[in-house]
Swiss-Prot record:
Residues 5-47, 76-119 form the SpoVT-AbrB domain. Signal peptide: none annotated. This is Transcriptional regulator MraZ. It comes from the Bacteria. It is found in: Cytoplasm, Nucleoid.
C-alpha cells in the first residue's frame, strides 16, 4: 500500500527520483499514465493488469468510455527505475501534468500520484477546507 507525501525535483532530462518507500512495492518496472485532476498515476504491473481487465468491461458503445480509455491507455508507459531510483517521465506526460522542476509524489492506497508541486499545493489547500464535508458525503464509509 502506498501512502505519504514526498517532494522531489525533475531534472533537465525529465528524470525524477521515486521515493525510497515506494520503490520496493513498485519493483523495478511499473506503469505511469495520465491521471485525474492533472496529475500522473503510477501502478505496479500487477495492479495495472487488474485495471486493464476492469476497463475491458466498459461499454464501447458509450462515447465517454471510448474517450476515457483512449486518454488513459494512450498515455500509459512502462518505466524502469535506474540505479539512482529515478524514472524518465516522457515529455507528453510532463506536459499533461504541467510538471515543472518542483514535484510532489504522493501515495494513494493502490497507486502513486506525481504532481507539479504548485498544482498539488493548490489542490491540497482547496481540499483541506472541505475534507470533513467530503467524508460526510461518502456513503457507507466509516473508519
Amino acid at each position: 500500500m502506498f501512502m505519504g507525501e514526498y517532494e522531489h525535483q525533475l531534472d533537465a532530462k525529465g528524470r525524477m527520483i521515486i521515493p525510497s518507500k515506494f520503490r520496493y512495492d513498485l519493483n523495478e518496472r511499473f506503469i505511469i499514465t495520465r491521471g485525474l485532476d492533472k496529475c500522473l498515476f503510477g501502478y505496479t504491473l500487477e495492479e495495472w493488469q487488474q485495471i486493464e481487465e476492469k476497463m475491458k468491461t466498459l461499454p464501447m458503445t458509450k462515447k465517454d468510455a471510448r474517450k476515457f480509455m483512449r486518454m488513459f491507455f494512450s498515455g500509459a508507459i512502462e518505466v524502469e527505475l535506474d540505479k539512482q531510483g529515478r524514472i524518465n517521465i516522457p515529455q507528453n506526460l510532463r506536459k499533461y501534468a504541467s510538471l515543472t522542476k518542483e514535484c510532489t509524489v504522493i501515495g494513494v492506497s493502490n497507486r502513486i500520484e506525481i504532481w507539479d508541486r504548485e498544482t498539488w499545493n493548490d489542490f491540497y489547500d482547496e481540499s483541506e477546507e472541505s475534507f470533513e464535508d467530503i467524508a460526510e458525503d461518502l456513503i457507507d464509509f466509516d473508519f
